[in-house]
Design a protein with these regions (language model features):
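ASCE RecA-like P-loop NTPase motor cores
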Residues: 1-123
Length: 123
C-alpha cells in the first residue's frame, strides 16, 4: 500500500522519533502539524505499528471526515467510528437507535480487546 511506503519514508527521516518514543512508552506526545496532515500521521503510525488507536476529533462532522481520510490510507475495514448519541439516550421518549448502539459497541469492544484498529470519536 502507498501508506507503507510513505510511513517508511517518514520513519527514515527521523522527524517524529521523539514523539513515537513517547507514545511507545505510554506518555503523551504533542506534534504541531496542519490539521490536514493529522489523518496522514495517524495512518502512518498505524501502518508502521498496528495497534488499538483512539482519535478524538472536534465534532461529529470532523470525526466522520477524519475517519474517511484515515480509511483511505489504511483501509476502511481498519477504521471504526464511535458515534455520538443523538439527544439523551436515556430519555423515555428517545427512539430506538440499534445501528448507532451497534456501531458504538463495536468500537468500544475493539478498544477494550486491544484490536488493531483506529477508532475515531468526537468531543
Amino acid at each position: 500500500m502507498l501508506i507503507d511506503m510513505l510511513s517508511a519514508s517518514l520513519a527514515k527521516s527521523g522527524a517524529l522519533d521523539d514523539a513515537w518514543a513517547k507514545l511507545d512508552s505510554g506518555q503523551d506526545a504533542t506534534v504541531g502539524v496542519a490539521s490536514s496532515a493529522r489523518p496522514f500521521l495517524v495512518a502512518a503510525r498505524f501502518a508502521a505499528d498496528p495497534r488499538a488507536t483512539l482519535v478524538v476529533a472536534a465534532g461529529e462532522e470532523a470525526a466522520d471526515t477524519f475517519a474517511r481520510t484515515v480509511g483511505a490510507f489504511v483501509g476502511e475495514e481498519r477504521v471504526l467510528r464511535l458515534p455520538d448519541y443523538e439527544g439523551n439516550p436515556f430519555s423515555l421518549d428517545a427512539p430506538p437507535q440499534p445501528r448507532l448502539h451497534g456501531r458504538r459497541l463495536e468500537a468500544l469492544w475493539s478498544l477494550q480487546q486491544g484490536k488493531p484498529a483506529v477508532v475515531v470519536a468526537s468531543a
